[in-house]
Amino acid sequence: MKKLYPFVLINIFISSIIAIRFFLVPEASFHWSAMVFSIFAVLGHFFSAYLLLLIICTPLLLLKQFIRNIILAILFSFFQIGLYIDTIVFEQYRFHINQSVLSMVFSGQIVDFSMLTYLLMLVLIVISFCAEYFILYFVNNKLVLSQKKSKIILLSTIFLFSSFLISHVVHMIAFYYAYSPIMAVKEYIPLYRPFTSKKIMSFFDVNGQRKVVYNKNNSNANVYYPKNPLVINPDNNKPKNIIFIVLDSWRYDTFSEEISPNTFRFVKQNNGVVFDKHYSTGNATRTGIFGLFYGIPGTYWDAFLRNSIPSLFITTLQKENYNIGIFTSAKVSAPEFDRTVFVTIKNLRISSKDGSASSRDKQITDDWLAWYKTRDASKPTFSFLFYDAPHAYDFPADSLVKFKPIGDLNYMTLNNDTDPLPIFNRYKQSVYYDDSLLQNVYDELVKSNSLEDTIVVITGDHSQEMNDNKLGFWGHNGNYTDAQTKVPFIIIGGKELEKIKGNSRKLTSHEDVVPTLMKHYLYVKNDISDYSTGYDLFSSIVDRNWLLMSNYSSYAVKTSSDIYLVNRLGISHHMDLHNREINETPNYQYIYEAMNHMRYFFQPEKNSLSNKLD
């Protein structure tokens, strides 16, 4: 073990040198603080990774030295080769290698390797193996651990361990204060998961000095959003009012005359367009709301959070001098929408008063009514109402229960054998309650004579499963089936909406909302591909074969017949629409197209966003 440890140290420094390539990608730009941090982060990260590998290899000490050296040389050489290949993948795609990338490459559908490529790979493997074996041979047979050399090894270990601690502590502080130059480093290092803890930081931040460090012209972002500067309303057209009404965890099958009668009637009376096959951009609030306000996949969340990049939809509203009212039942800072979507809004309403979800929902309704009645009516208005009762299965205790039998929710006892009916009835009751609150909003829009000049978007951030797939899934953030991703989606707002009815039975996504509103109601003249990967709902949707969805730790490419999931470890699963594994080859062309959408805003050049991407 004593002689194996110097071998590990040498490999740590070799990997650190290879990792420099991650930071040399075109257009990469780093603040000096990020450059210093990246040194500690890379060294500390590989120190922990190789220590883990060393522990795994400990049983090899029982083998003969020759056999042990061959196995170690193979393992460590493949580790270094994998790292080098990852630098190539990262340079081209701006994300790290994973199983789905490997499957796509070796499927033969997307990439064809020449004989020269295979020969070069073989040469690389041979050279790497020989180098590792030579290092092992030297360490075992030639290296004499004198007192001086032992001291060097000890100091190296102390330095590497200190780098590990420093990088994690610094990242925790940077994350708390939203210091993007430091946070941006994370995306460059493979499998790097630096420490974050708001609780620890808030303990030291006794004076409440936490703030968002937002730089309007962040040159360190390495995110090209938009692709070109926006040309906004050059003809000075009169913009319309816009209101987003979003219910957390709203199932598509609970928009009905029975469960949400007020909304159902309001939509019918005002010729609203109801979309039958609409999906969120995720199965969790973070990515669902992100896609709704940005018009791009939720996979960009981490990069946009690290760099505090606001929604172009919101900044366009601000440039057009809109009244903006953000009313969320739950905290707008969890997830960190105050550091992403709404980062440019001053005096942002962070939270409602403490209380149950249903009481907070009533509070945001009352707050919105008070704000809306006293707004500056000479200016256009945007408002966002985000209700939480369905997410919590909550309604006031004195409510008249409409859906029976009704049961209490206890996540500890939920399993595949639990009867969903009482729980589903509780959920329906919570939707029914929020619908009663929304009648006040609808009445005010009519009473104030502003409805004719208002675009109303009604939807959910994601859906809510009641063990629909009979696999023990309850709630959301668990899979990408319809039960967790399909949501109601309705647009109300004037005769011109007749033009979008042709898409109401087609596959649509939260990504389509921003480009539709930006183009037709905020009069942005740019190509949609400058700022979104979504579709214009006023134009006929053709050849949409897949949707990209994500959550906190995975993403999925969903088609009309299957789901291709990639988890946080990069391991892929090919499943049917009910989340059961299938032994079939997925359509790697679709996966390739989806990956191009995932990297599109990480590339300075503007490539095509058609179904045949380069």
Protein language model regions, located:
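Generic structural signal for small/hydrophobic residues in well-ordered secondary structure
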Residues: 43, 248-250, 292, 317, ...
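Active-site-proximal alpha/beta segments of enzymes that process anionic O-linked groups
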Residues: 159-411, 521, 534
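A long, amphipathic alpha-helix that forms part
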Residues: 191, 366-373, 408-454
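A short beta-strand-to-alpha-helix junction
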Residues: 304-309, 421-434, 479-485, 498-515, ...
